[in-house]
């Protein structure tokens, strides 16, 4: 079985400048997210062979063939579709306060959508002794997970955009496509999973 992102994408050419920029971007992202200086120093340059082994590129008769993963990571051929973000005044979509479309490579979409939500949600504070700790109204780790899962696990064969809607009482992340066959919201609430 092959995954959608490992399928070759028709009519897209691989440019060495795009491959170099992708390798650089992925390395910089890894360095930025490293937990320590030691980990940062251990991060090596990425190579075309690594992209091939990960299924980002395919090799056929000495030619590099782009996959949908390559298109999403380099933001080419309309992939990934834009992420639509909005803040609504109340508990419905009648009046929006702010909106933004994020049209970027998939790794930037995750980060920019996450930062957008953090900018728009309320922040409070908790005091421990003489120290103040800022606390978001929603857990940032959960927000990041929702957004990353929506982008990574969406059905890219379905048209449409991922929508991130912040209401006065909740955050909704909507992804095109439906649930897997045999999965219903009721079953999910009872712990059912196809994973």
Task: Give the role of each language-model region.
Residues 1-195:
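Active-site helix-to-loop segments that bind/position phosphate- or nucleotide-bearing substrates
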């Amino acid at each position: 079985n092959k995954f959608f992102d490992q399928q070759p994408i028709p009519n897209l050419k691989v440019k060495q400048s795009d491959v170099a920029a992708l390798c650089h971007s992925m390395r910089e992202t890894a360095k930025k997210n490293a937990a320590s200086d030691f980990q940062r120093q251990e991060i090596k340059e990425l190579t075309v062979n690594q992209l091939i082994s990960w299924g980002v590129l395919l090799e056929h008769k000495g030619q590099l063939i782009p996959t949908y993963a390559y298109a999403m990571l380099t933001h080419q051929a309309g992939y990934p579709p834009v992420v639509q973000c909005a803040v609504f005044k109340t508990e419905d979509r009648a009046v929006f306060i702010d909106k933004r479309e994020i049209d970027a490579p998939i790794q930037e979409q995750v980060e920019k959508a996450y930062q957008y939500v953090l900018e728009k949600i309320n922040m409070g504070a908790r005091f421990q002794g003489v120290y103040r700790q800022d606390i978001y109204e929603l857990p940032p780790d959960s927000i990041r997970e929702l957004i990353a899962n929506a982008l990574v696990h969406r059905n890219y064969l379905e048209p449409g955009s991922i929508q991130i809607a912040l209401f006065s009482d909740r955050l909704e992340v909507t992804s095109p496509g439906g649930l897997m066959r045999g999965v219903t919201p009721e079953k999910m609430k009872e712990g059912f999973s196809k994973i």
